[in-house]
Amino acid sequence: MLRQFIVSTVGRRLQLPMMAQSRLASNLDKTEYTTPGEIVDYDDPPHLPVPEYPVRPDEPLEIRKQRLLYQSRKRGMLENDLLLSTFVAKHLKDFNAEQTAEYDQLINGVSNDWDIFYWATDTKPTPPQFDTEIMRLLKEHVKNHEKVQRIRQPDL
């Protein structure tokens, strides 16, 4: 169906239905213009509750590391998938119980993955509760002083 639509519109000017044109025109009035590099970051709506992440104090260290490895690779946001999976591949094996707990709090205690990205890239200041040894390690990792290509997640 889509292929037929594309083939039938090649070389022709696509005419939008009148309703779509009026909706497009009404949205143009509400467009916000930003400068290049400006971050558009809206607050979460108050009617959207953020669930509390369950603390797992009795979880064995190796199980916690396996869970954090999985959660670092499956963020739902490519930028963080690449940053966190390469960070974990490099550092997680050397973390002790306290460091893994800090990392767990960092990636699971934040309700918005964009916050982690902005803090790690120093685009926004890191709040004091997340400004830990692990965050400093992550920021150094993001700077990529070794100039390592990070276009895919490391192999398991």
Curated annotation (Swiss-Prot):
Gene3D superfamilies membership: Flavinator of succinate dehydrogenase (1.10.150.250)
Official protein name in the record: Succinate dehydrogenase assembly factor 2-B, mitochondrial
UniProt keyword Mitochondrion, yes or no: yes
HAMAP family: SDHAF2 (MF_03057)
Stretches that traverse the bilayer: none
Keywords annotated in UniProt: Chaperone, Mitochondrion, Transit peptide
Organism of this sequence: Drosophila simulans
GO biological process assignments: mitochondrial electron transport, succinate to ubiquinone; mitochondrial respiratory chain complex II assembly; protein-FAD linkage; tricarboxylic acid cycle
Function: Plays an essential role in the assembly of succinate dehydrogenase (SDH), an enzyme complex (also referred to as respiratory complex II) that is a component of both the tricarboxylic acid (TCA) cycle and the mitochondrial electron transport chain, and which couples the oxidation of succinate to fumarate with the reduction of ubiquinone (coenzyme Q) to ubiquinol. Required for flavinylation (covalent attachment of FAD) of the flavoprotein subunit of the SDH catalytic dimer.
Keyword Electron transport found: no
Gene Ontology CC annotations of this record: mitochondrial matrix; mitochondrion
Subunit structure: Interacts with the flavoprotein subunit within the SDH catalytic dimer.
Main location: mitochondrion
Domain of life assignment: Eukaryota
InterPro entries: SDH, SDH_sf, SDHAF2
Protein localization: Mitochondrion matrix
Residue interval of the organelle targeting sequence: 1-24
Xref: Pfam families: Sdh5
Protein family (similarity comment): Belongs to the SDHAF2 family.
